[in-house]
Design a protein with these regions (language model features):
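Metal-associated gating/positioning segment near the N- to mid-region
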Residues: 2-62, 84
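Metal-coordinating catalytic core of metallo-dependent amide/deamination hydrolases
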Residues: 65-121
């Protein structure tokens, strides 16, 4: 058994902009299934996704059971507007905005809350 502990199903590791464009209108189920199938073939049974702003990781979690994968996601990361995190999350401006995003994540069934507090290391 193997696990992927820092995935972003919305990304492809080649071209971020092209990968995200595949999901702009709605999560692209065919692309998501390609990722899930590749993980299944690699005997990966646990995936911890970092979330995204388009609902892609949320849909992946819904489909993952078909592939024998335990899929966890925050649905989206939470970041302060104008700071690092826009590629995988939603912004807040003040404490009330932050509270609303946490409530939204809970409502959508987030497995954990991801808070962006630093940039790329």
């Amino acid at each position: 058994m193997f696990g992927e502990c820092h995935a972003h199903v919305i990304m492809d590791g080649k071209n971020y902009k092209a990968a995200v464009a595949l999901h702009k209108e709605r999560p692209n189920e065919a692309v998501i299934r390609e990722h899930l199938s590749a993980w299944q073939q690699a005997d990966i049974t646990f995936v911890r996704d970092g979330g995204d702003a388009y609902g892609v990781s949320e849909r992946a979690r819904e489909l993952a059971g078909e592939y024998g994968i335990d899929y966890r996601t925050p649905i989206f990361a939470i970041h302060k507007r104008g700071h690092y995190g826009g590629i995988v999350g939603l912004p807040y401006d003040d404490r009330q905005g932050y509270r609303e995003l946490v409530q939204e994540a809970r409502k959508r069934g987030a497995d954990f809350i991801k808070i962006m507090i630093s940039g790329i290391m």
